[in-house]
Amino acid sequence: MSANENNLIWIDLEMTGLDPERDRIIEIATLVTDANLNILAEGPTIAVHQSAEQLALMDDWNVRTHTGSGLVDRVKASSFDDRAAELATIEFLKEWVPAGKSPICGNSIGQDRRFLFKYMPELEAYFHYRYLDVSTLKELARRWKPEILAGFTKQGTHQAMDDIRESVAELAYYRENFIKL
């Protein structure tokens, strides 16, 4: 497959918390869709190694969630640091989307971008400056047509690839039921 500037890059990170000055990325996943939200390829899902000291800083919610999903064990066993995960992700993306063409796509994606800017700046720079944030449509639906929200339920596994697939499906749902193209 050759890189196509109309393809969309979807990304999700799992982190030890929400503050990029204190917390770290522990999982990254990407996938690529065409402009019509058909999934073309799933990139690597990478647990990013962090020290025991860093993991010990997680709050109760993060400990419970990431231990329960098995992510903490995968992080401890991982040989990928931030840079290796960043480079592996970029190598995958180069096959599908030229640099600087796709907005960063996902749910509440501004939070992920803050972590990319700090810990994976080359990957952050691979994206266009624009955002395609599914949570924007969710917030608009909540205010303008709240009954729409009941039609889509997320599993909320807080595993990066699952979360991305849900974001794509959620946007497709809003396209059909809210935007009505």
From Swiss-Prot:
Q: Which GO terms describe its molecular function?
A: 3'-5'-RNA exonuclease activity; nucleic acid binding
InterPro entries (alphabetical): Exonuclease_RNaseT/DNA_pol3, Oligoribonuclease, RNaseH-like_sf, RNaseH_sf
Gene name, please?
orn
GO CC annotations, alphabetized: cytoplasm
Task: Give the protein's recorded name.
Answer: Oligoribonuclease
Q: What is its main location?
A: cytoplasm
Q: Where is the active site?
A: 129
**Location of the Exonuclease domain:** 8-171
Q: Which organism is it from?
A: Citrobacter koseri (strain ATCC BAA-895 / CDC 4225-83 / SGSC4696)
